């Protein structure tokens, strides 16, 4: 790990083991696909209304404020690094009308008559000067945030609002996200942008990228043959059908049948990670999983990102004799 620098030295002296910086920022591809579309920050800020809590008409923290707050925290914490602009993806558009246009035919509506906001939004912010190369793939440090109004009760009075925030590494070959437990807040509840800002700084400060990169590097040292690969995919398909009492004794697996099928197709056809007809190393297997996860809806994307990491590392350990994930290879 000769290329990674880590976090501001004043705050993270003990965790900075290897370091180096220097690279040019590249335009990124989609980190999530599914049914999302790309939008600009200006569109969210200027063209979208802000939902409220129905019982007291108190404002929610809208998507633009969420993104702006995390970007500010990122630029503050990584003040000596180059920070990219947010790449924003949204889904599930909610359309409405202003009161004056309630009785207008749809064909006669003006843009000024319409209202719009998005139920779900996700964004990523790359820090390209903090990077590492694994198996020839460049990984940039990246912050990812997710907001989904469908996971909140907007029909009540104002209460703490749910956000998801992660810091990890993005594979620049394919924009697959590598997320670990210590870099993920899955249940971040706040009532203001000030609380959100502080929570982001706390997450960045507790993050230990050297440990993550060590584990990711280890995946390249293990291979499995085609029979083992097919065995694992079969067990992953079987997992979906197991009764609850049986599933409780097996590590969680969140990928859907469709995503498992995508892993199988990518094993044959993917331009970066296909291994059809030969042994596949666990780094490639991991990227087949994270690639399939890009088809997740926004509200389940980060949970599945973490789960794909756990599965890849768990199966890697099982191939070396560990018992926890042994069911998937036995």
Located regions from the model:
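Feature for intrinsically disordered/low-complexity regulatory segments and propeptides
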Residues: 1-71, 77-82, 86-90
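Intrinsically disordered, low-complexity regions enriched in serine/threonine
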Residues: 1-25, 105-330
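A short acidic/basic microdomain associated with nuclease active sites
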Residues: 76-115, 119-122
């Amino acid at each position: 790990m000769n290329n990674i620098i880590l976090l501001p030295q004043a705050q993270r002296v003990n965790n900075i083991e290897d370091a180096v910086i220097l690279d040019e920022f590249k335009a990124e591809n989609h980190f999530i696909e599914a049914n999302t579309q790309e939008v600009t920050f200006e569109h969210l800020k200027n063209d979208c209304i802000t939902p409220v809590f129905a019982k007291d008409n108190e404002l929610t923290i809208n998507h633009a404020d969420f993104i702006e707050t995390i970007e500010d925290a990122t630029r503050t914490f990584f003040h000596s690094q180059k920070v990219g602009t947010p790449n924003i993806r949204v889904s599930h558009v909610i359309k409405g009308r202003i009161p004056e246009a309630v009785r207008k035919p749809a064909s006669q509506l003006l843009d000024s008559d319409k209202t719009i906001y998005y139920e779900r939004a996700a964004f990523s912010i790359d820090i390209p000067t903090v990077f590492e190369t694994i198996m020839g793939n460049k990984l940039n440090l990246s912050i990812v945030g997710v907001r989904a109004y469908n996971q909140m009760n907007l029909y009540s009075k104002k209460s703490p609002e749910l956000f998801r925030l992660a810091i990890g590494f993005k594979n620049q070959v394919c924009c697959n996200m590598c997320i670990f437990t210590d870099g993920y807040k899955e249940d971040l509840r706040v009532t203001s942008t000030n609380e959100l800002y502080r929570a982001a700084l706390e997450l960045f400060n507790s993050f230990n990228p050297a440990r993550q990169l060590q584990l990711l590097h280890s995946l390249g040292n293990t291979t499995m043959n085609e029979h083992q690969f097919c065995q694992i995919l079969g067990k992953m398909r079987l997992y979906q059908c197991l009764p609850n009492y049986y599933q409780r004794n097996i590590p969680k697996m969140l990928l859907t049948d469709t995503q498992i099928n995508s892993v199988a197709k990518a094993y044959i056809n993917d331009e970066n990670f296909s291994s059809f007809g030969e042994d596949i190393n666990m780094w490639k297997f991991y990227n087949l999983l994270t690639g399939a996860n890009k088809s997740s809806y926004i509200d389940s994307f980060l949970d599945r990102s973490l789960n794909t990491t756990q599965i890849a590392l768990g199966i890697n350990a099982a191939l070396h004799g560990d018992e926890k994930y042994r069911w998937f290879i036995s």
